[in-house]
């Protein structure tokens, strides 16, 4: 059909189907952990037959090795308005082991320098508790919280920014989300000032007018 009408939309649709086929063909191999060594599984704390965040971290490493360029991992259950002490202990143990194993594994395999690892969420938690008794927790808090980056040309061992004595507001080297985006785009080789989209007659930047690359974070 494409040879008859030479419609680029038909060619695009054909390529989409071909890409989907290649991805489906590769998926069973990617998720087969039987080829991983016992030492690797123990390092991640993975039971191949049970879903876990650590298992997802190991799958992420396998996807990176296979050439996947963007991977997003989710971990649910952090909305800790109650039962914070009990729930966070459990979740931190599960997450810390998997993410530490992933970073170490990427470094051992020579992949960390070309892989940018980003850890964080859309907000933190208040430094004061809500609720009472054994069911206390912390509310949403966007005014001062932490994210971390590893690999991908990021300077290791660097702390950027500081909160007040209560841990409530960021007061030193405050970093806006547009600064974060500008820095990440820079590490991906994209000039954030030229990455624009047009809406209602004018150009907009994803990093707005104030976003800047935070060079103190770069190796």
Which role does the model predict for each range below?
Residues 1-219:
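Ligand-binding pockets and gating/stacking loops
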């Amino acid at each position: 059909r494409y040879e008859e009408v030479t419609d680029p939309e038909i060619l695009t649709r054909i390529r989409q189907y071909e890409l989907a086929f290649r991805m489906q063909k590769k998926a069973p191999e990617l998720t087969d952990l039987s080829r991983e060594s016992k030492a690797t599984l123990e390092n991640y704390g993975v039971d191949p037959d049970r879903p876990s965040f650590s298992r997802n971290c190991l799958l992420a490493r396998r996807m990176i090795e296979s050439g996947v360029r963007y991977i997003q991992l989710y971990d649910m259950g952090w909305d800790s308005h109650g039962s914070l002490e009990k729930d966070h202990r459990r979740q931190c143990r599960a997450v810390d082991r998997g993410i530490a194993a992933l970073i170490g594994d990427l470094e051992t395999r020579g992949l960390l320098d070309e892989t940018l690892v980003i850890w964080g969420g859309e907000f933190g938690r208040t430094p004061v508790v809500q609720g009472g008794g054994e069911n206390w927790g912390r509310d949403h808090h966007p005014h001062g919280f932490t994210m971390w980056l590893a690999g991908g040309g990021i300077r290791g061992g660097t702390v950027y920014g500081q909160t007040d004595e209560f841990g409530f507001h960021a007061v030193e080297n405050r970093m806006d989300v547009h600064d974060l985006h500008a820095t990440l785009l820079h590490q991906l080789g994209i000039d954030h000032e030229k990455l624009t989209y047009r809406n209602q007659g004018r150009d907009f930047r994803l990093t707005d007018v104030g976003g800047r690359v935070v060079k103190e974070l770069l190796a």
